[in-house]
Amino acid sequence: MKISINSHSSIRIDNIYFDPFQIKRATHNAKYIFITHTHYDHMSLQDIDKVITLDTIIIAPQDAKQALEEKYQNKIIYVAPNDNISLSGIEVEVLPSYNIGKEFHKKSSAWVGYKIIYNESSFAVLGDTDNIPELAALNCDYLFVPIGGTYTMNSNEAATLTNKIKPKFVIPTHYGSIVGTKKDETDFVKKINKGISIKILL
């Protein structure tokens, strides 16, 4: 199993892609493309073009409908927080993803994160979110958590959430490109409790 982050929050697990962005080399091998929300750095059509095939299934929030259907003939599944769906080879739980006290990602937008069960492991990709109450009970093997601040939780808030969830592995995201720095990464790593393995992929 190969896990990588191309840039920012552009995550790949084998041929499963989340928010493809700044893709340097076209692969055209995506089985699934998951979109967390419609901001340009998370739903980039020019980057989707580089990984999509005729058989790719796209999973996205409802407000992505017009842009996706104007361009793609693929099967598209629209989801909302707390949905559960079954796909070939994976189970999907749709997570809420929003800001508290900030206007960038409103709860009313119904934007999402995803927890998938794949290859006998569970992976949680949180999207652009703060440390919201709904995530406190999350259970996963691999946690992809944003740490860059401004549009998401900051490194301290992300570490607090990670230590509460207690995943086997944590992978910090959403820094080093548009917002967030290597210092945020360093601060995050220092605050993670022993027993949680940290994977740095950016």
Please place each PLM-identified region on the residue numbering.
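Binuclear metal-ion centers of metallo-dependent hydrolases, dominated by the metallo-beta-lactamase
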Residues: 1-4, 72-85, 136, 159, ...
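Redox-cofactor binding/interface segments in oxidoreductases and associated redox assembly factors
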Residues: 34-35, 93-97, 145, 172
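Active-site regions of enzymes building and remodeling cell-envelope glycoconjugates
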Residues: 29-37, 71-81, 89-92, 141, ...
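Short, acidic/turn-prone active-site loops that include or flank metal/cofactor-
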Residues: 22-23, 38-40, 63-65, 80-85, ...
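Portal/gating segments that form or line small-molecule/metal binding sites
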Residues: 48-66, 71-100, 112, 186
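Metallo-beta-lactamase
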Residues: 115-168, 172-181
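Active-site metal-binding motif and surrounding structural segment of the metallo-beta-lactamase
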Residues: 22-67, 139-144
